[in-house]
Amino acid sequence: MASNMNKKNDDLLIIKKLYIKDISFENLLSSKKISSNSEPAVDINVKLSSVNIENNDHELILYIKAETRVEKQIMFIIELQYAGIFELKISDEKKNREFVVEGAKILFPYVRTIITNITKDGGFNPLIIQPLDFNKIYSN
């Protein structure tokens, strides 16, 4: 039964490699006490890009930048580019949207885990990014 549930993705792409392409974490309040009782504000920007590497192999990159502030002080900034190499089993150009959206859904749990762990290891409450609508992100 599980193989039938995954049939749509199996027809579309094969995961060949997943990796961190670039990462940066700036801990701007590590040695300072946060004196505010205010809830931190988090701004998250997300971008997707894909490039054909060769033949049917494509690299998909999920870019996430998160900036967290308390009042006017920046607590931390994290920038992550997480990528995957996928073999596309389709060649129809209108399927590009489906590839990018499905590929981003594969990459996202890894991105969320990395960001959660880095912010926790940076001395802050873990930043847990809520599920994203990759169809909407692709459209923008």
What are these model-predicted stretches?
Residues 1-140:
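N-terminal intrinsically disordered, cationic/polar leader segments
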